[in-house]
A protein has these predicted regions:
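Acidic/His- and Gly-rich active-site-bordering loop/insert found
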Residues: 20-122, 127, 131-152
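N-terminal amphipathic/basic-hydrophobic helices that include classical n-h-c signal peptides
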Residues: 1-18
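Conserved short loop/turn motifs at secondary-structure junctions
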Residues: 47-48, 156-160, 308-313
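Short Gly/Pro-enriched turn/cap motifs at secondary-structure boundaries
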Residues: 71-73, 161, 194-198, 386-390
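General structural feature for long, well-ordered alpha-helical segments within catalytic domains
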Residues: 20, 31-34, 38, 51-62, ...
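Divalent metal-coordination and catalytic microenvironments
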Residues: 42, 83, 94, 126, ...
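Histidine/acidic-residue-rich, glycine-tolerant segments that coordinate divalent metal ions
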Residues: 79, 101, 109-121, 127-128, ...
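Metal-dependent amide/peptide-bond hydrolase catalytic core
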Residues: 230-500
Length: 500
């Protein structure tokens, strides 16, 4: 790929791809204030997954006002968006997320000060995530129109990445079947189009049903559902020694009874089971279920297993990484102001240098020593992580099993600060987050335009994708006919509001 590639437009003149990109980038620059306002508005909404009513409506309305054909409520999710402009091939997709996380609300200040006590916050930067994809899609639309170029730009608004994997339902509904390639962006603490995979995961709830009784007067008549939950947890914790080193199993007790003097007749736990590959998760999941059944036998309770689904491991794309990295370098990384650096330095006081070093080493960052005293990364890195597996999981992975896809990162969080934290919330609403947004939007727009105007790039990406799959085929996890858990999401969202 070269930025000097030329091709015929709708007239007789020659067009360079850099001319088309600069048109898209100019639209982003001209609308910088509007884009940051949308980003900040979504930051303020901070809505739970599958309940992102205001955030999704804002994005959908903005796309509609800019000429996109918009469908809101696809794949059985009221907050899922499918919007497109143009016609014909190629069809290039962008993806935007806009769900927030519970318990990490914070003001845009470099210390812990909740905006709402125990409230929701964008501790993974999804206010930036969704706005970036929206902005890039609109910018591409105007660039294509300006030069009379064909093809279709399609925006996917994907709810509930953090809890229910909204993209999975969109994949199962066939909404990606005609797409040629897909580009996503995620705020992070580095500027890189990475090549690591992600952990596959299963999400499952275990519901136990027993009998109530007076815990002091006649406990022999009770059968404690909470005992079953606790015995199951003990069993799983003993099992940890006997699974692969890379596996991760974590849980919360969602319901444990009302008060101590009543034997609880209902209790439940929510588990995540992760491993680097789907075929490693499944056997661990079966063992966890056996432990759950054993706990029910020991306590004479009834068990209901609610396998809410899971996620695949990500299929990386060197071809798409090269395209994105080249566009990152064309755009240039953000320049941090003195105010940005002071803000970041204050946040850096909230964690230790030792934990930062541990993180850099764990992520195998090249020449990690030079980043020990860096708070905001200002350079663009070449991907170093091919063959590695990141600790987290993402529903972008499920998309990557059906089409070539990538999710690149731009620096937004303070280097060394944890994800899903008040620190990330503060950065996501600050000028640091705004600069990450603009950089990412331009990078995504340029990358999409390369794919739309260079057929060879798409051929290369598709050939690599097929090779990496090694003949494996995407199959639904759990019940293929399951529906998004809308009622459950609303109940959780209401409960979280009650805590706030």
């Amino acid at each position: 790929m070269t930025p000097l590639t030329t091709f015929l437009g709708s007239g007789t003149h020659l067009i360079t791809i850099i001319m088309v990109k600069e048109t898209a980038w100019k639209w982003i620059d001209d609308h910088r204030d509007q884009l940051t306002e949308i980003c900040d508005t979504i930051w303020g909404y901070a809505e739970y997954g599958l309940c992102e009513d205001k955030s999704s409506r804002l994005i959908a309305d903005t796309l509609s006002k800019n000429g996109f054909k918009v469908k809101l409520g696809v794949a059985g999710m009221p907050t899922a968006i499918l919007a497109e402009w143009g016609e014909g091939r190629p069809i290039i997709a962008t993806q935007g997320e806009y769900d927030a996380l519970p318990g990490i609300s914070n003001k845009v200040v470099p210390w812990k000060e909740p905006l709402v006590e125990d409230g929701m916050g964008h501790g993974c930067g999804h206010n930036i995530h969704g706005t970036t994809a929206m902005a890039a899609s609109i910018a591409v639309r105007y660039a294509l129109e300006a030069f009379g170029l064909g093809g279709t730009i399609r925006f996917y608004g994907t709810p509930a990445e953090e809890n229910f994997g909204g993209k999975v339902f969109m994949v199962l509904d066939g909404l990606y079947d005609d797409v040629d390639a897909c580009i996503s962006h995620h705020p992070s603490d580095m500027n890189v189009a990475g090549l690591s995979s992600s952990n596959a995961t299963n999400g499952v709830r275990f519901h136990y049903y027993g009998k109530t009784a007076h815990a002091a007067g006649n406990p022999e008549m009770g059968r404690s559902a909470l005992d079953a939950v606790e015995l199951m947890n003990v069993g799983v914790n003993y099992m940890r020694e006997h699974v692969i080193q890379e596996a991760r199993i974590h849980y919360v007790i969602e319901n444990g009874g009302g008060q101590p003097n009543v034997v609880p007749d209902y209790a439940s736990s929510w588990y995540y089971i992760r491993a680097p590959r789907r075929d490693q998760v499944d056997p661990i999941f079966e063992r966890v279920k056996k432990i759950a059944e054993g706990a029910a036998l020991m306590t004479e309770t009834e068990l209901k297993v609610d396998h809410s689904g899971g996620l695949y491991n990500l299929i990386p794309s060197r071809s798409l990484s090269d395209v994105v990295t080249a566009n990152m370098r064309l755009v240039g990384a953000p320049e941090w102001s003195e105010e940005d650096l002071e803000f970041a330095a204050e946040i850096a006081k909230s964690f230790t240098k030792e934990s930062k070093i541990d993180g850099l080493r764990k992520d195998k960052v090249p020449d990690w020593e030079k980043y020990v005293d860096v708070d905001l990364v200002a350079e663009i890195l070449d991907p170093w992580d091919e063959g590695e597996t990141s600790a987290g999981s993402t529903d972008v992975a499920d998309v990557s099993w059906v089409i070539p896809a990538i999710e690149f990162c731009t620096a937004c969080n303070v280097l060394g600060a944890p994800g899903h934290s008040w620190q990330f919330v503060a950065c996501s609403g600050s000028s640091i987050g705004h600069k990450s947004l603009i950089f990412a939007s331009k990078t995504m727009a340029g990358s999409v335009l390369d794919l739309m105007t260079s057929p060879d790039l798409l051929v290369k990406a598709k050939e690599e994708h097929e090779k990496r799959l090694e003949g494996q085929v995407y199959k639904p996890i759990g019940d293929p006919d399951r529906k998004p858990p809308l009622e459950q999401a609303r109940e959780i969202a209401e409960r979280l509001k009650g805590k706030a």
